[in-house]
């Protein structure tokens, strides 16, 4: 028994290819439709407007979405990750002003922490700087790739640093109606086009004190990394599950693939159990991040092998442009997972050098 209503999943299946290939009205509606199902309230205490349960349930919901549309799952990951950061800041402003708006989908949550993840691993400089003029702080810079940044009413979270003090960086969240803050046209991708992905520019945006989630980005992000990375597994789990399900339907005619199918099913379940075991104690992956990084690398390989199996099981029919199998969409979606920040290559680099 899944979490989502049959009515919603039917709508999502009907629009999945359109959302994948186009910047469209269905894509604009997606966050609110997912929110209407109560998805973003899972894993949040009832006292804050949630429905309780755990991080595992959040991942299961993202996996269910990914079985139907990776775009839907990815923007939901961004939404839920931003919510998680708001829940773990000492700054009450965001809980009081934006939490319910994010839970209901009135506001979209654009998580733009990929630059920060690379920065904290000494792989990249911060894209947004904090400038001080006449006692005021301003944001100056550009985030080149941010998903779930709708045309209006979104909140974006990122890390900005002081150019003259590289050791100091802030985690900040800025609303889309901030003065001197602009959004580009949608970036053009081969897949996930309906995810409202754009570049965001800060042209001396006045940094208000209430927008600062933490003045110690290193510590804040390290504490919240298990959820940031852990929730991403939902995308991979769902895509692999759908692919392996499609393979299973063909095993009667393609029995030669049975052993390999069983192996991938076992690998998927082993990774899932290791992840859930680590997330059951929020501090475990904080102190053992290498284990989380390796699991993330491993799940990318499982998705790739599952998709290759699906191609072999389905044969040439999935390659026709008018095929209704959804395979080519899943194939393109699968190509996105190795490059989601932190990418598989970045994680390999961290493991090799630390």
Give the residues covered by each predicted segment.
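C-terminal helix-coil-helix/basic helical segment that borders enzyme active sites and/or dimer interfaces
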Residues: 16-22, 249-252, 269-304, 308-322
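Amphipathic, small/basic residue-rich leader segments at the start of a protein or domain
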Residues: 1-76, 285, 354
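A gly/ser-rich beta-alpha-beta helix-loop segment of oxidoreductase catalytic cores
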Residues: 108-131
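Glycine-rich beta->alpha junctions and the first turn(s) of the following alpha-helix
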Residues: 187-269
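A short core secondary-structure module
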Residues: 145-181
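Glycine-rich phosphate/cofactor-binding loops in nucleotide/flavin-utilizing enzymes
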Residues: 316-354
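N-terminal glycine-rich flavin-associated loop
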Residues: 70-92, 122
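A short, Trp-centered hydrophobic/proline-enriched beta-strand micro-motif
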Residues: 34, 40-42, 104-116
């Amino acid at each position: 028994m899944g979490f989502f209503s049959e009515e919603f999943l039917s709508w999502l299946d009907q629009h999945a290819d359109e959302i994948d290939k186009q910047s469209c009205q269905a894509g604009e509606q997606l966050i609110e439709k997912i929110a209407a199902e109560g998805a973003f309230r899972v894993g949040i205490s009832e006292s804050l407007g949630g429905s309780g349960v755990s991080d595992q349930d959040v991942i299961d919901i993202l996996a269910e979405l990914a079985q139907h549309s990776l775009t839907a799952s990815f923007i939901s990951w961004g939404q839920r990750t931003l919510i998680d950061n708001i829940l773990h800041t000492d700054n009450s402003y965001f809980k009081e002003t934006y939490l319910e708006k994010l839970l209901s989908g009135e506001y979209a949550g654009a998580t733009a922490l990929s630059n920060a993840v690379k920065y904290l691993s000494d792989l990249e400089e911060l894209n947004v700087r904090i400038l001080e003029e006449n006692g005021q702080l301003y944001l100056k810079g550009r985030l080149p790739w941010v998903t779930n940044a709708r045309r209006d009413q979104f909140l974006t979270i990122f890390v900005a640093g002081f150019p003259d003090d590289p050791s100091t960086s802030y985690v900040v969240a800025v609303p889309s109606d901030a003065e001197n803050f602009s959004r580009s046209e949608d970036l053009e991708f081969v897949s996930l086009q309906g995810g409202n992905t754009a570049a965001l520019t800060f042209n001396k945006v006045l940094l208000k004190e209430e927008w600062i989630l933490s003045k110690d980005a290193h510590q804040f992000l390290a504490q919240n990394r298990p959820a940031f990375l852990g929730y991403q597994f939902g995308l991979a789990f769902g895509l692999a599950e759908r692919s392996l399900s499609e393979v299973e339907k063909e095993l009667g005619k393609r029995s030669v693939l049975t052993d390999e199918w069983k192996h991938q099913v076992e690998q998927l379940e082993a990774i899932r159990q290791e992840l859930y075991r680590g997330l059951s104690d929020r501090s475990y992956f904080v102190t053992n991040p290498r284990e989380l990084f390796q699991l993330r690398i491993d799940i990318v390989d499982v998705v790739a092998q599952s998709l290759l199996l699906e191609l072999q099981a389905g044969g040439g029919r999935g390659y026709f442009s008018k095929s209704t199998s959804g395979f080519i969409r899943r194939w393109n979606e699968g190509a996105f997972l190795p490059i989601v920040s932190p990418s598989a290559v970045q994680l390999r680099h961290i493991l090799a050098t630390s």
